Curated annotation (Swiss-Prot):
The name this protein goes by in its record: C-C motif chemokine 2
Self-association and partners: Monomer or homodimer; in equilibrium. Is tethered on endothelial cells by glycosaminoglycan (GAG) side chains of proteoglycans. Interacts with TNFAIP6 (via Link domain).
PANTHER family, alphabetized: C-C MOTIF CHEMOKINE 2, SMALL INDUCIBLE CYTOKINE A
Signal peptide residues on this chain, from the entry's feature table: 1-23
Transmembrane segments: none
GO biological process: antimicrobial humoral immune response mediated by antimicrobial peptide; chemokine-mediated signaling pathway; eosinophil chemotaxis; inflammatory response; positive regulation of cell migration; positive regulation of synaptic transmission, glutamatergic; sensory perception of pain
PTM annotation, UniProt: Processing at the N-terminus can regulate receptor and target cell selectivity. Deletion of the N-terminal residue converts it from an activator of basophil to an eosinophil chemoattractant.
Species of origin: Macaca fascicularis (Crab-eating macaque)
Main location: secreted
Organismal lineage: Eukaryota, Metazoa, Chordata, Craniata, Vertebrata
SMART domains cross-referenced by the UniProt entry: SCY
């Protein structure tokens, strides 16, 4: 009986530390971009190409990262009205096909 209990314990330990047991989904190991400071200036919508929201629990603040037409990324506070207006403008641009 002691041998079977010891064997069972050994198998459980081996299963816990096997490579498959240590494997994690790629999303867990993916790098997270966080914003620690926000821009103090309003950015003209003509300079903006796209945006993405940052809502990761690994980041200290929720944020919006705007990407400009020259590929510069700028962190902004999603609570500010100009940020919300800029996101709305970009959303409408995507929905409206260009001739």
């Amino acid at each position: 009986m002691k041998v079977s209990a010891a064997l069972l314990c050994l198998l459980l330990i081996a299963a816990t530390f096997s490579p498959q047991g240590l494997a994690q989904p790629d999303a867990i190991n993916a790098p997270v971009t966080c914003c620690y400071n926000f821009t103090n200036r309003k950015i003209s919508v003509q300079r903006l190409a796209s945006y993405r929201r940052i809502t990761s629990s690994k980041c200290p603040k929720e944020a919006v990262i705007f990407k400009t037409i020259v590929a510069k990324e700028i962190c902004a506070d999603p609570k500010q009205k100009w940020v919300q207006d800029s996101m709305d403008h970009l959303d409408k641009q995507i929905q409206t096909p260009k001739p």
